[in-house]
Amino acid sequence: MENLKTYTFDEAYKASLNYFAGDELAARVWVNKYAMKDSYGNIYECSPEDMHHRLANEIARIEKKYENPMSAEEIFELLDHFRYIIPAGSPMTGIGNDHQVASLSNCFVIGIDGDGDSYGAIMRLDEEQVQLMKRRGGVGHDLSQIRPKGTPVNNSALTSTGLVPFMERYSNSTREVAQDGRRGALMLSVSIKHPDSEAFIDAKMTEGKVTGANVSVKIDDEFMEAAVADKPYTQKFPIDSSNPLVEKQISAKKLWGKIVHNAWKSAEPGVLFWDTIIRESIPDCYADLGFKTVSTNPCGEIPLCPYDSCRLLSVNLYSYVENPFTKEAKFNFELFKKHVAKAQRIMDDIIDLELEKIDLIMSKIENDPQCDDIKHAEYHLWEKIKSKSSKGRRTGVGITAEGDMIAAMGLRYGTQEATDFSVDVHRTLALAAYRSSVEMAKERGAFEIFSAEREANNPFILRMKEADPQLYEDMLKYGRRNIACLTIAPTGTTSLMTQTTSGIEPVFMPVYKRRRKVNPNDADVHVDFVDEVGDSFEEYIVYHKKFLEWMRVNGIDTEKRYTQEEIDALVAQSPYYKATANDVDWLMKVRKQGAIQKWVDHSISVTVNLPNDVDEALVNKLYVEAWRSGCKGCTIYRDGSRSGVMIAVSKKDKKKADKEKEGATDMPVKPLHNVVEVRPKELECDVVRFQNNKEKWVAFVGLLDGYPYEIFTGLQDDEEGIALPKTVTKGKIIKQIEPDGKRRYDFQFENKRGYKTTVEGLSEKFNPEYWNYAKLISGVLRYRMPIDHVIKLVSSLQLKDQSINTWKNGVERALKKYVVDGTEAKGQVCPVCGHETLVYQEGCLICKNCGASRCG
């Protein structure tokens, strides 16, 4: 590899800040997530312009293999400044990046052909899930093949444990896999026909359970009809068997009520209207050839068959509005159609680039030093993925900035007029993408198993035939390059760089406040807030970029420091008024999703945001309307139903808040615990494992009333360390007094058979220096210092020895899981967006501003 120029973070950030016209958040996101880097963190690109040249050159290299190639310059113009076409994160990071051996695919689904109801099959999926996640992919798989709890099995267990233990296994595997500083993404699904579906639905209601996965229930029309009409419904296993091993009748209405309640309470499970998905699915016309859809990717926008994958790309809808925010605003449909055709072509090129990446992955596996027995499973996994990718050539062309497009056209998101316009745009997109796929079939050949006869009665194809008969005739004649083409995904950090609304969603808030820490002694500093430790903060207004554009177009001063009342008045004048995520008419949003879904061959990822005070009846109404409207899935989020998420504040709460103590924030209530001077003889204990300079360590956290009271740490699996089975996660710490009066602490746990095992003398297992620091930390825990303050104290310890610093980090990780969800991480800055908006959630730090997460 040639010696490439490298840049410091500051150099890349400064150049990117200039590129994004001063948008600090966009600049930080790009440098941290998308600039080309090697495994040592060296940065090889100075700004997104470098990245777009890298992408354009690689895509143009593939174009040269085919007729009528696009040039690198033409492709660059489409990508530049994220104006028209934006590949998703994995393609942006991986294309042309020889420093990483990773897939370009955003998402995968895995599964077992035939009988998946065996430990071997379950373990195989666990291994495959991990292997994909380490290459950056999100993974989905279905658990409907696992036999229900209590059914006979031919092993020493005698009866099956059911689905839930395996949900926890797959969830834990996800949490263990690091993908560039974040956890992997996992979707677990199950059919409502399965006798264990109720246990699946309830699994995440237990705090701390299945925290590494999204869960969705595959619901058929028969169940929905039974739930609405309050009729019985039959569950069975195997779910599609005419001669099932297990069969039982349930109240569909009662189980549906549980789905609604859990979604209202915790935003999960999501619902997948499976009959609609299968009925509309073009790939399922080839189900007998391996394209039977079994689950979805983690966000739900791509239903997939086992070992298929998808790469995503978005078209920036705002960029096609001419004279935005004026009476002359017009959508340029002709330019849009041309660009969608090129976007579909670029997506097909990216499939070829992905096949090259898969070859590199397989070559690396072959050359890895491990024995062939170990490497075989991973190698075979990529063989299967390569086969499906080349056979179907599936793409995921989508959109972003729908909310801004609607506002720029002078329409209000959530109205019938705006929905009708959006449907026109998505119909145009679908026809242009399919036209492009047919044209490529002429030039490059159709996907390997194309059959017009198989697809003849597919509802999506029939809609295309009615809308554009000539396109349909050409498809019969030439075929199609791609088995399926379209999706609408959540665009997340990508929309931060387009500086637009995300995906199909409305704007979250057009104007909001942020705080930055300031030195009160500096000149011209305005202190708006002082926290409990005395740090000073200045509040400043952040405008959504396109709202700022509306202000400019209408001659409104964008530099003035406005009062809250003035800001409210400005928003009321704008097309964003009553069109935010929390304002839009919920039923209209669901109906809009259903109307647009008719022109999207995969699915749509969209969330219906609800205020905290809505009841379960509304959630029920929205879900039923989603089913009737033709949605393939539906997700709701009730404000405050999950901790660690940005909470919206209503105006009626504002007056009440203003009267309260200055600086008070809407924080979770921290539990108050009495100080217990005399340690009980026995304490419940959690076991937490971590790495310390490549050594395996274990922490024992003694708990009093469920709250950390003391901590012990030591080496694990060492002759001088602590021998402990990996399955042990809980036990007791027992205080003993020896004959000479010395105190000793023992750890006791129960093995799988219920027998107690005691590890004596925890304190003897420690390096004296570690032991002294552990005693210090235990002291502040004993006197009930809040856990987040203890973590801050531990992190502030100035230790010279690298090994003990690493140990200190492990102690922090062990304690984070006890911080109350939603607690703010005072004084800590998000490494992605640079703002002090981090909160603790399930032991991880989550940024309320940009959604970045950091565990450990």
Tell me the role of every PLM-derived stretch.
Residues E2-P69, E73, N155-R169, Q179-F291, ...:
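Conserved, charged catalytic cores of large soluble enzymes
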Residues I219, E280, C285-G290, N297, ...:
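Terminal amphipathic helices with adjacent charged low-complexity linkers/tails
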